[in-house]
């Protein structure tokens, strides 16, 4: 998946109010960018970190720049949570996710459950597969952890997926790891113990838990391979 062109190299000054971040461009200009990530971004928002921004000149945009990538622990990390759904869809369509082949159509953002929208609904003549996509950026030691902040929304999604299984459909919680380090994915129990409990409950009740790594670079982001999940 190609990132917006061109990207602008920048240095992070600070992130604040969740959706705002200040950067210094190579020219020395200081700009405020939209931060498309509602999590804590633990380990990914250290002042002085190299970053890449995209730019939109649409007149309705209040902030022209969007934060796309940050460099931490020696690797580029994709922090834009608006991209993983498209990334996973492209990977499925290109045959890169063996577990999700054989479906005739893929529909994005379909309403289901209690006022929820599933990220991807895979359909064929005799089966529906509900896929919830989660962007993962936190690494501690060898573990890639989710979530990086308590998430009642994520908890709700797991309950909704269990409901889908009870209705006789297939349900998948799909972790996308947008960084090169870390050896396995695990729930961040110290950050959100209820999410960890629900993830284990979901797995025990038929929800499939998948994790794939993405190669992240200014040239683009692509799914590269499967990671193990440790409960």
Swiss-Prot record:
Belongs to the SfsA family. It comes from Geotalea uraniireducens (strain Rf4) (Geobacter uraniireducens). GO terms for molecular function: DNA binding. CDD domains: SfsA-like_bacterial. Signal peptide: none annotated. This is Sugar fermentation stimulation protein homolog. It holds the Pfam family SfsA. HAMAP family: SfsA.
